[in-house]
Amino acid sequence: MAKWNVLIATMLVCNGAVAQDSLKNLPELGMPLTDRKLVVAHCMTNIIRFKGHKFEDSCNPDYFSPQGNITAAIGGLTQVLPMEDTLLRGASLDSTVAFELRAARASGIDAFQFYYPLHTDAWDEIIEAYFRVSDALHIPFSFTFCISHPSGGTQDYRVGEFARRINRIMDDVGRNNPRWLRTPDGRLIVYLWSGAGLADIPAGAPSPAFCVARAFKQLADQVHERFACIYDINEQITPAKLNDFLDYFPACWIWTLPYHEGYIGNMVAATCAERHRTFTGSAFCDFYTSKLLAKGTWNIYSAEGAAEAGLEKSDRKYIVTGLSYNFRKLLEFGISRDVPLINIITWNDYPEGHHLAPEINHNEGFSILLNYYKSVWKKEPSPYGNRDVAVTFFKQYAHTTVPKPYNFALVPVERGIDPASEDSVEVVTLLRKPAIVTIHGHSVSAPAGLGVTRVFQAEGPVSVSVSRDHVDVLRFRTPAAITLHPLRTNRLTYSYSSEHEAFFTPLVGNQPLWPLP
């Protein structure tokens, strides 16, 4: 009997090795992901405002004010105020989707990868609306799924649930719909975000990456597709772990790891090049959780839960981004590697503060930068080549200032950029010719093309002007102001630019946008 047990165990190991070898280093893993450069943004599928569908509590403007709502005891739950809520709370789903698509295109985005967790069937109609509206309005845009933190049940259950929903969407919008984000050889590009949970990974498995690849192959088979999966990196990954996943995956993308001298992207990009895998660029503009979390966890409070927990049992997560520094450097890093895809983190995750979508703090500033860098990356003329542009970025108080009375614990989730770098006013200029930039009365010379100028913070609104030969070519003053006495914790970056009206008028006309932050 013992001999039979040994024989059976040997057969199982051999069969596993054969299966593993059948997925390892497949020729298609070294094939191109795309034949054109694209900006792909992570889209939080359910964070959208239309009639009968509110924003989740962590970005719901009902809890923006520090008074007059159930979260007044903590000075207001949220610090974000999306433009959509001001304009589209009574609109149809299709009308809101049309606004989202136009705003994304104006921001330089070509495609969405939809945040896609289990047990969110109601979201599928939103995804289908994007296909429907982009087609009806002839808006060039591509779409795909981002399989996100699956958990619960067995691998067969998780795969089956995703397959059921994906099949329904693909059948409804058309499997051959040209808006699906595909490789030149026809594979469906699928993103992972904490996606390894799709697989059952036995304790001590010699290759967790094989288990994950096998699970995604099972999902691809059940939706009658071939996948090109982009593996997610949200840690200081080791070369050994990275190589294990590159044995089975054609590409990877990095989540919110900030740029600094030891940026993990250097190792990841070099390893991908050695392995003939695709390194895709990533950039995020900010990171501060308007959502309130149970202290020491990532558990999100509802508005009622936040009010009940109060300041002592809550915290907010934060990554120092150096105003626009991190966003610019990550874009420059991707351009220097001539990546085929640049991933924007994110389009509309207002609760984590890394959104490009129009909102009271970020406005259009980061979108202006993305449009400029996109033209450099694609070796095309700058969209601002015929005029002078200035964009300012600042925090609304210095990092050493203590808000009163609503001071939340701030927990840094990544390090690398000096917090003091955010105690300034930064102005990024895109100039036709050299000029003088004046900020708060401090004047400095700025070069043609892209330039960055910083001055110390000063209380009040930020005034910016650009002049040549003592004549102003542009001038603006920010609606928001720097304060010495903040009421509540808020480390969101504020941005505003000389392009404010030119950016928003095609989107909203002359409608009032929002109050002051």
What do these predicted ranges mean?
Residues 20-423, 434-450, 457-472, 476-517:
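Glycan-processing catalytic domains of CAZymes
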